[in-house]
Amino acid sequence: CIRRSWPIEAFETLIDLIAPNLYAYRDRFFTSFAATFEMFGKAGLIAFVVGLFFGVLLVVTRKGGVRENLLVYQVVNIVINVFRSIPFIILLIFLIPLTRAVVGSAIGVKGAILPLVFGTVPFYTRQVEVALAGVNEGKVEAARSMGSGTLGLIFRVYLHEAVPELIRVTTVTAISLIGLTTMAGAVGAGGIGSFAINYGQNQNHQDIVNVCVVVLLIVVFILQSLGNALARRTTNRGLF
């Protein structure tokens, strides 16, 4: 048989000492951890693209925008407000029929992606809108006077100038999405949230709950640190 590397063995020994109940379910824990990041990765990528699109759309179609269209702005604005006002746990239940129709299942990782996207996109859209709205209008007007079209203004002015702030709001959204994935676990999506409930709280294994909390805190700390580092780099030296 293939011998496992010493870091893995050392980690498992440490877990056995500080969290014996978790050690007994270690395989399930690692599977749940992987499921959480699968949900985070897939839903996050979709939400990033869709949220960025709608955030840009709101900025360019608002009153005084480069492509003012109040009808489009109001429709998108209302839809975003409606979905932002729905608590995520209610949104999960509300979207069950749509999730089944689209992906064929409302449970498991596959069934969690769509609700996570619906729960994240409105929040991220607003964050992007605020970030882009902070771009100096003088630079926008200067680019327009030089003949830049709508796409040129979007990519060369709005998105380029707002890179540091976009990184910050993306970091905030990513951290929020981690929280949503744990909530999704409460209704059968799997992941760390489901593991903490089923193997921790329901079986009165507090050490399992404690380790899950610590793991999530570490993940959040890493995301925040990376986001801060990238934002500082783009602000001070320019990543692009």
Task: Pin down the residues of each PLM region.
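Non-cytoplasmic
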Residues: V169-I218
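C-terminal transmembrane helix and the adjacent membrane-cytosol boundary/short C-terminal tail
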Residues: L57-K63, V209-F240
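Periplasmic/extracellular loop-to-transmembrane helix junction in inner-membrane transport proteins
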Residues: P7-A43, N69-Q74
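Cytoplasmic-entry segments and transmembrane alpha-helices of multi-pass inner-membrane transporters
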Residues: L57-F94, L116, V121, Q127-V130
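Short helix-to-coil transition segments within interhelical loops
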Residues: L132-A162, N202
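Transmembrane alpha-helices
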Residues: T150-T181
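Transmembrane alpha-helix signature in integral membrane proteins
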Residues: F29-V60, T170
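Loop-to-helix entry region at the N-terminal start of transmembrane alpha-helices
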Residues: T31, A35-M39, R84, F88-F123, ...
